[in-house]
């Protein structure tokens, strides 16, 4: 699952954003990708042109439900303090891939989730 498809918070634009490359890479591995974004879902839908392996969600927790990993791509404020127990209990594998390094790794791990911050040592 992916939280955040817009190229930056506050925008509905997805062009040249990192989410597009991630989605394409996942599709190349035959992965169905579930995405939440507060503004960019219409633009993402146009970009995907009806691709059957892209599922768009109005609710971030529905996007993450049963997911084997959740990648934070755009650091929208609504993602800053998620309900960690809800994520842990609903995900297939509670793995958080923090592409913006906004979460405290020790705290997330202490909540019972796996954590990897992209670019962290």
Q: Where would I find each of the regions flagged by the language model?
A:
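Structural/interface elements that position substrates and couple domains in central-metabolism enzymes
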Residues: 1-121
């Amino acid at each position: 699952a992916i939280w955040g498809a817009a190229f930056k918070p506050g925008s509905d634009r997805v062009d040249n954003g990192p989410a597009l490359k991630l989605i394409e890479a996942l599709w190349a591995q035959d992965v169905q990708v579930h995405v939440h974004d507060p503004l960019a879902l219409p633009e993402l839908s146009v970009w995907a042109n009806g691709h059957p392996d892209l599922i768009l969600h109005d609710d971030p927790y529905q996007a993450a439900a049963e997911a084997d990993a959740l990648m934070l791509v755009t650091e929208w404020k609504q993602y800053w303090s998620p309900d960690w127990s809800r994520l842990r209990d609903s995900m297939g594998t509670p793995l958080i891939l923090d592409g913006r390094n906004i979460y405290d790794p020790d705290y997330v791990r202490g909540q019972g989730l796996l954590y990897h911050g992209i670019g962290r040592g």
